[in-house]
Amino acid sequence: MAKHGKRYQESRKKVDREKLYSPADALELVKDIASANFDETVDLAVKLGVDPKHADQNVRGAVVLPKGTGKEVKVIVFAKGEKAKEAEEAGADVVGADDLAEKIKGGWLDFDVAIATPDMMSVVGKLGRILGPKGLMPNPKVGTVTFELEKAVKDAKAGKIEYRVDKNGNIHLPIGKVSFPVDDLMENFKTIIDVLLRERPASAKGRYMRSVTVSSTMGPGIKVDPNQAIDLIRK
């Protein structure tokens, strides 16, 4: 077990580990106990009642957070001709084709999102071993393999994030920074809960949203009442 520092231990004392907090109270507490000397990310962890070994229960997709992530997102685009121009005008940081692929093969990975037009996938596919393990491979399921580059680039810049359930049924997502007002964190929180509820697989049995936890980068987890999280959407 890793030992936590003094700040973490002090923060942990302020959290009732037996209590299920309301979403608003949990987010207030995350902000209150954040003590690092940088703007910590606020993370949301949701455990779903799914078995990812079954393809139809592999919950996956992408969502645009209405208040953004608070992070500057570097976007690269694989495209040629008019589509390359469209990507540049939409605000992509780097646009290229074979030259960009060679740059990545050489070890350059200074970006957060990679987007490609479908006709470029013969080039991008060869980067699978590099981009795949880092979660950077363009994928049509999350809208990063597309001819609609203006929308894809602007969504990525605005705070579009991908999610995918892990082998234990957990999904981890950033919902902003501790510097965000609670109302902004709540709006992002609600958006993700809403998306996950809509994505419930028809074959999932029993309770779907089993646990919800929020935390800051350096802080302890704060348990949220899943029923209250769901009620935010059903009101």
From Swiss-Prot:
InterPro entries reported in the protein's UniProt record: Ribosom_uL1_bac-type, Ribosomal_uL1, Ribosomal_uL1-like, Ribosomal_uL1/biogenesis, Ribosomal_uL1_3-a/b-sand, Ribosomal_uL1_CS
GO terms under biological process: regulation of translation; translation
UniProt entry tagged with the keyword tRNA-binding: yes
A GO term for molecular function: tRNA binding
Role of this protein: Binds directly to 23S rRNA. The L1 stalk is quite mobile in the ribosome, and is involved in E site tRNA release. Protein L1 is also a translational repressor protein, it controls the translation of the L11 operon by binding to its mRNA.
Quaternary assembly: Part of the 50S ribosomal subunit.
Protein name in UniProt: Large ribosomal subunit protein uL1
Organism: Halothermothrix orenii (strain H 168 / OCM 544 / DSM 9562)
